Amino acid sequence: MRQQIIDQWVKGEELKDLSVHIKRDEAARILVRALNKEEKEATLADYQEKANKLGLFNSLSASETISKQDAVKILNNAKNVKNGVGNNEGVKEISVEDFMKNPGNVGYELSPDGNYITFNAAWENRRNVFVKKMNDDSEPVRVSSSTDRDIYASFWKDDNLLYLKDKGGDENYHIYSTTFNGNEEKDLTPYPNVTVGVLSSLQGVKDEILIMMNKEDAKVFDVYKLNLKTGETTHVAKNPGNITSWIADRDGNVRMAVASDGVVGTVLYRDSEKDEFKPFIEMESGDQVMPLGFTKDNKHILAKSNKGRDKVEVVKYDLEGNEEVIMSNSEVDVAGVLYNSEKDKVLYGAYVTDKTHYQFFDEDFEKLFRKIQNKLGVRESELVINDYNKEMTKFIVSVSSDTVFGKYYYYDSTTDEITELATLGSWLNPEELAEMHPISYKSRDGLTINGYLTLPKNKEAKNLPLIVNPHGGPWARDMWGFNPEVQLLANRGYAVLQMNFRSSTGYGKEFLEAGNKQWGLKIQDDITDGVQWVIDQGIADPKRIGIYGASFGGYATLAGITYTPDLYAAAVDYVGISNIFTLLNTIPPYWETARKQYYERIGHPENDKELLTAASPVFHADKIKTPLFVAQGANDPRVNKAESDQIVEALRARGVDVECMVKDNEGHVFQNEENRIEFYNTMLKFLDSHLKK
């Protein structure tokens, strides 16, 4: 009787009898075999797993025996999978709010003694700082009261609680102090139009830290010693105008700096703060030598370097400039390492291929890492050591994946106990989310382009609407992991393509420099070639392709609909560049030391005028015919609001209707929760109206 019922459904006949109960695993076996036309038998557990991935059991109870009511749901889910029609049928539609609201407690950090933790959590719709004593039943105490803007980051200095915050997205971050009861918040750097960064926590020095601040000259950062009780600053190092970064030794003495003429850098060194800086490592064009810090004895320097090689490696220099390679990878750049000053040793390093991988240099630390990994039952690429106390006995770790937003845990190695601290996006069910698949394809000139393809659940990977999502930068990269906007799009039935086009970081010097002066040209070709690859696989419907990106991704969006106007049926430009000339004229003052490098990588406004004119979409708006939605923060210090204004005005002058959203209290991408939710709701409606007709 049960088989007869399924046979009727498979043949498309009306179901005549649903009165017979059927076990979940048996239903999984019959339906999966019918849907996939499988000939070979598998285990019942395998069928259940496939059925879950297909979404056949969505919205069902956990009972092993399926009722008549549940049978109807299963068959409807299976019918939707079989037909592959509609708005991602068989998958529960998850609201924009659930993807884009504040996900919960984030940014956990241990106090230096390991007895307290801080984290950021929502209060009055803004992320604020909370503190909690460990191994204690007391409630967390809110110690900040920001109602206009999320706290950017918080950190400890001995028993001092500090946090960073800007105003309206202007990225002029100030350092604030607060107390354990939150009654005394104070801006320690209350100077107009400055931005501050922390250089050293000055271990062993009470109530003082080293900061970098552009107080004297907006274009460059000097070094100051900041008293956390009084707010008094003492000038430690004056920037002559070409220093891009400073490095303090383990005692807090500023003994190293990186200078640049805008293209070529030089690492400078001095024996003490009384001495003059002298060249230590001379770089050539394309070289990167980024000092990470001094070793315990202050006689060696760890650095990330690609000097004399294609890939970034982690090296150790002695004070004579002799180099020892600590970690390298033949395929990709080394992302970073964890150095422990107590052991005077690099414990492990990370590199990113399709996912994040680790190379260990300390046997005890690897055993600890594997123990935590096994306790949590996760893959290596899903586990991160976030923070630890001085003795490295207490740890904050986090777990995330493509379908898991994230979880924080506290691990005490002295008791071997692990405690869950928070689940991000606890209202999201990983089984309802889409997997992120690493992919690669060849560009038209033979480069291997790596990327990711996320496919909607319960939909056959055939003739799907596709959203192309180029990353920002462009000197950045996409990585495997949880991405709320990608999951939102996949949940609504879209395939999402992300690619690391030439000029992306992580793949070596040659790959990055292949994108020099290629905005709108070979970089854009890499994006177009990725779209064509997905079409050739039969996955994407060539008539239902949209493109959406932020920052440089916004530029790539505008370039896509300008230079390949027949490829895209809808486009969303989020804080994107439309005019390269005005971009270069309005960079933040503290980016001035890198101006020549921008000319090298993007183009010179005078020497490359023809190139930049051809590559700026605003001058070719007459080619644009794709429906466009533009979103912009009014206070954006990186991509000025004028970038959006220009393209909107140019298109409207031709009578083209362009949707536009501007938020006066935002900067480079929207940070405030209500603005994020409004933006993504509007974007979805816009995309659906053009790609789901």
Which residues make up each language-model segment?
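An edge-strand/N-cap motif at the start of beta-rich repeat modules
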Residues: N87-P103, L110-S111, N115-I117
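Peripheral, non-catalytic segments that deliver or gate enzyme domains
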Residues: M100-V106, P112, E124-V129, S145-Y152, ...
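Beta-propeller domains
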Residues: F119-S144
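Short beta-strand element of the alpha/beta-hydrolase
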Residues: K462-G472
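A fold-wide structural signal in alpha/beta-hydrolase
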Residues: A490-N500, E659
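Active-site-proximal cap/loop segments of hydrolase catalytic domains
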Residues: F501-K693
